[in-house]
Protein backbone atom coordinates (compact mmCIF):
# COMPACT_ATOMS: atom_id res chain seq x y z
CA UNK A 1 0.00 0.00 0.00
CA UNK A 2 1.10 3.52 -0.73
CA UNK A 3 1.87 5.58 2.35
CA UNK A 4 0.78 9.18 1.96
CA UNK A 5 0.66 12.09 4.35
CA UNK A 6 -0.42 15.64 3.62
CA UNK A 7 1.43 18.83 4.42
CA UNK A 8 -1.09 21.66 4.08
CA UNK A 9 -0.12 25.31 4.48
CA UNK A 10 -1.89 28.64 4.16
CA UNK A 11 -0.01 31.50 2.51
CA UNK A 12 -0.45 35.24 2.31
CA UNK A 13 1.98 37.36 0.34
CA UNK A 14 2.15 41.07 1.16
CA UNK A 15 0.62 43.29 -1.54
CA UNK A 16 3.02 45.32 -3.64
CA UNK A 17 3.51 48.80 -2.22
CA UNK A 18 6.05 51.58 -2.41
CA UNK A 19 6.53 51.37 1.34
CA UNK A 20 10.11 50.66 2.46
CA UNK A 21 8.90 47.77 4.61
CA UNK A 22 7.65 45.83 1.57
CA UNK A 23 11.13 44.54 0.73
CA UNK A 24 11.50 43.08 4.21
CA UNK A 25 8.00 41.59 4.19
CA UNK A 26 8.39 39.86 0.83
CA UNK A 27 11.81 38.52 1.84
CA UNK A 28 10.24 37.01 4.97
CA UNK A 29 7.51 35.47 2.82
CA UNK A 30 10.01 33.68 0.58
CA UNK A 31 12.12 32.60 3.55
CA UNK A 32 9.05 30.93 5.04
CA UNK A 33 8.40 29.18 1.72
CA UNK A 34 11.98 27.90 1.71
CA UNK A 35 11.56 26.52 5.23
CA UNK A 36 8.34 24.80 4.21
CA UNK A 37 10.03 23.17 1.22
CA UNK A 38 12.86 21.95 3.47
CA UNK A 39 10.41 20.38 5.94
CA UNK A 40 8.75 18.38 3.19
CA UNK A 41 9.57 14.66 2.98
CA UNK A 42 9.22 12.27 0.06
CA UNK A 43 5.97 10.91 1.51
CA UNK A 44 4.42 14.35 1.92
CA UNK A 45 1.83 15.70 -0.48
CA UNK A 46 2.41 19.44 -0.22
CA UNK A 47 -0.58 21.74 -0.71
CA UNK A 48 -0.19 25.50 -0.37
CA UNK A 49 -3.30 27.62 -0.67
CA UNK A 50 -3.66 31.32 -0.24
CA UNK A 51 -3.60 34.87 -1.50
CA UNK A 52 -0.31 35.44 -3.31
CA UNK A 53 -1.09 39.03 -4.39
CA UNK A 54 0.69 38.51 -7.70
CA UNK A 55 -0.29 38.23 -11.35
CA UNK A 56 1.55 35.14 -12.57
CA UNK A 57 0.02 34.99 -16.05
CA UNK A 58 -0.76 31.91 -18.11
CA UNK A 59 0.80 29.64 -20.69
CA UNK A 60 -0.99 30.64 -23.86
CA UNK A 61 -1.53 27.48 -25.94
CA UNK A 62 -0.60 29.45 -29.05
CA UNK A 63 2.86 30.15 -27.66
CA UNK A 64 4.16 26.64 -27.18
CA UNK A 65 7.53 27.84 -25.92
CA UNK A 66 5.90 29.28 -22.80
CA UNK A 67 4.82 25.82 -21.68
CA UNK A 68 8.44 24.67 -21.72
CA UNK A 69 9.77 27.88 -20.21
CA UNK A 70 7.26 28.03 -17.35
CA UNK A 71 6.09 24.49 -16.47
CA UNK A 72 4.63 25.86 -13.23
CA UNK A 73 1.74 27.39 -15.19
CA UNK A 74 -1.17 25.89 -17.08
CA UNK A 75 -3.17 27.28 -19.99
CA UNK A 76 -6.28 28.29 -18.02
CA UNK A 77 -4.84 31.16 -16.01
CA UNK A 78 -5.46 34.85 -16.59
CA UNK A 79 -3.16 36.68 -18.95
CA UNK A 80 -1.02 39.50 -17.62
CA UNK A 81 1.84 39.64 -15.15
CA UNK A 82 3.52 42.07 -12.79
CA UNK A 83 6.90 42.14 -11.06
CA UNK A 84 5.64 40.18 -8.05
CA UNK A 85 4.08 37.58 -10.35
CA UNK A 86 7.24 37.09 -12.39
CA UNK A 87 9.27 36.57 -9.22
CA UNK A 88 6.74 34.08 -7.86
CA UNK A 89 6.55 32.25 -11.18
CA UNK A 90 10.33 31.91 -11.37
CA UNK A 91 10.46 30.68 -7.78
CA UNK A 92 7.82 28.02 -8.44
CA UNK A 93 9.66 26.90 -11.57
CA UNK A 94 12.94 26.54 -9.67
CA UNK A 95 11.21 24.45 -6.95
CA UNK A 96 9.28 22.28 -9.45
CA UNK A 97 5.91 23.52 -8.20
CA UNK A 98 2.62 23.81 -10.07
CA UNK A 99 -0.08 26.46 -9.77
CA UNK A 100 -2.95 23.99 -9.94
CA UNK A 101 -5.54 26.73 -10.41
CA UNK A 102 -4.08 27.58 -13.83
CA UNK A 103 -4.42 24.04 -15.20
CA UNK A 104 -8.18 23.49 -14.85
CA UNK A 105 -11.07 25.15 -16.64
CA UNK A 106 -13.98 26.17 -14.39
CA UNK A 107 -17.16 24.11 -14.83
CA UNK A 108 -19.11 27.25 -15.77
CA UNK A 109 -18.32 30.06 -18.23
CA UNK A 110 -14.59 30.21 -18.82
CA UNK A 111 -14.16 33.94 -19.41
CA UNK A 112 -11.66 36.09 -17.48
CA UNK A 113 -14.21 37.32 -14.89
CA UNK A 114 -14.99 33.67 -14.09
CA UNK A 115 -11.35 32.58 -13.91
CA UNK A 116 -10.52 35.58 -11.74
CA UNK A 117 -10.91 35.26 -7.99
CA UNK A 118 -10.50 38.87 -6.87
CA UNK A 119 -12.25 42.02 -8.04
CA UNK A 120 -10.80 45.42 -7.30
CA UNK A 121 -13.51 47.45 -5.59
CA UNK A 122 -11.30 50.36 -4.64
CA UNK A 123 -12.54 53.82 -5.46
CA UNK A 124 -10.46 55.97 -7.80
CA UNK A 125 -10.73 59.76 -7.78
CA UNK A 126 -10.42 61.28 -11.24
CA UNK A 127 -10.16 64.85 -10.01
CA UNK A 128 -12.17 67.33 -8.04
CA UNK A 129 -14.43 66.42 -5.14
CA UNK A 130 -17.87 65.91 -6.66
CA UNK A 131 -19.49 62.48 -6.35
CA UNK A 132 -19.32 61.96 -10.12
CA UNK A 133 -15.52 62.00 -10.06
CA UNK A 134 -15.30 58.80 -8.00
CA UNK A 135 -15.47 55.53 -9.93
CA UNK A 136 -14.94 51.86 -9.23
CA UNK A 137 -11.91 50.21 -10.83
CA UNK A 138 -13.80 46.96 -11.30
CA UNK A 139 -10.87 45.03 -12.77
CA UNK A 140 -10.62 41.31 -12.09
CA UNK A 141 -7.43 39.46 -11.19
CA UNK A 142 -6.34 35.92 -10.38
CA UNK A 143 -4.44 36.25 -7.11
CA UNK A 144 -5.57 33.23 -5.08
CA UNK A 145 -4.03 29.87 -5.93
CA UNK A 146 -3.43 26.31 -4.84
CA UNK A 147 0.18 25.22 -5.30
CA UNK A 148 1.35 21.60 -5.35
CA UNK A 149 4.55 19.76 -6.24
CA UNK A 150 4.92 18.42 -9.75
CA UNK A 151 5.22 14.86 -8.43
CA UNK A 152 1.77 15.13 -6.83
CA UNK A 153 -0.02 17.00 -9.60
CA UNK A 154 -1.52 13.77 -10.97
CA UNK A 155 -3.55 13.51 -7.76
CA UNK A 156 -5.43 16.74 -8.44
CA UNK A 157 -8.91 16.37 -9.92
CA UNK A 158 -9.80 20.06 -9.96
CA UNK A 159 -8.54 23.37 -8.63
CA UNK A 160 -10.33 26.64 -9.24
CA UNK A 161 -13.35 28.80 -8.42
CA UNK A 162 -16.62 27.33 -7.18
CA UNK A 163 -19.92 27.92 -8.95
CA UNK A 164 -21.78 29.44 -5.99
CA UNK A 165 -20.51 31.51 -3.09
CA UNK A 166 -22.46 31.93 0.14
CA UNK A 167 -20.34 34.70 1.68
CA UNK A 168 -19.99 38.32 0.67
CA UNK A 169 -16.36 39.01 -0.20
CA UNK A 170 -14.26 40.65 -2.88
CA UNK A 171 -12.44 37.30 -3.14
CA UNK A 172 -14.10 34.42 -4.95
CA UNK A 173 -13.96 31.09 -3.14
CA UNK A 174 -11.64 28.52 -4.72
CA UNK A 175 -11.44 24.82 -4.00
CA UNK A 176 -9.10 21.90 -4.60
CA UNK A 177 -10.28 18.36 -5.22
CA UNK A 178 -7.65 15.70 -4.67
CA UNK A 179 -7.52 11.95 -5.15
CA UNK A 180 -6.56 10.27 -1.87
CA UNK A 181 -6.97 6.57 -2.68
CA UNK A 182 -7.29 4.75 -5.97
CA UNK A 183 -9.26 1.76 -4.72
CA UNK A 184 -10.80 1.14 -1.31
CA UNK A 185 -12.68 -2.03 -2.29
CA UNK A 186 -11.93 -4.94 0.02
CA UNK A 187 -10.46 -7.99 -1.63
CA UNK A 188 -11.93 -11.35 -0.59
CA UNK A 189 -9.31 -14.06 -0.11
CA UNK A 190 -11.76 -16.93 0.46
CA UNK A 191 -10.66 -17.56 4.05
CA UNK A 192 -13.20 -15.43 5.89
CA UNK A 193 -16.26 -17.53 6.80
CA UNK A 194 -18.63 -14.57 6.92
CA UNK A 195 -17.49 -13.49 3.47
CA UNK A 196 -18.17 -16.99 2.10
CA UNK A 197 -21.68 -17.00 3.61
CA UNK A 198 -22.46 -13.58 2.12
CA UNK A 199 -21.20 -14.70 -1.25
CA UNK A 200 -23.47 -17.77 -1.23
CA UNK A 201 -26.43 -15.65 -0.11
CA UNK A 202 -25.90 -13.22 -2.99
CA UNK A 203 -25.92 -16.11 -5.48
CA UNK A 204 -29.30 -17.31 -4.13
Roles of regions detected by a PLM:
Residues 19-22, 82, 203-204:
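Intrinsic-disorder/low-complexity, polar/charged segments
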Residues 13-25:
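Surface-exposed cleft-lining segments at the edges of enzyme active sites
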Amino acid sequence: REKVQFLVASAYAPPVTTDASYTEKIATFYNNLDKLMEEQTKEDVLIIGGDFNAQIGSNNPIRRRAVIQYPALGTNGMQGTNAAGIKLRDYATSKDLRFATTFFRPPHKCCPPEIANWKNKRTIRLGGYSASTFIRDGKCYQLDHFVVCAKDFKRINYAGPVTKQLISSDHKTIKLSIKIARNLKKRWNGNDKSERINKVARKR
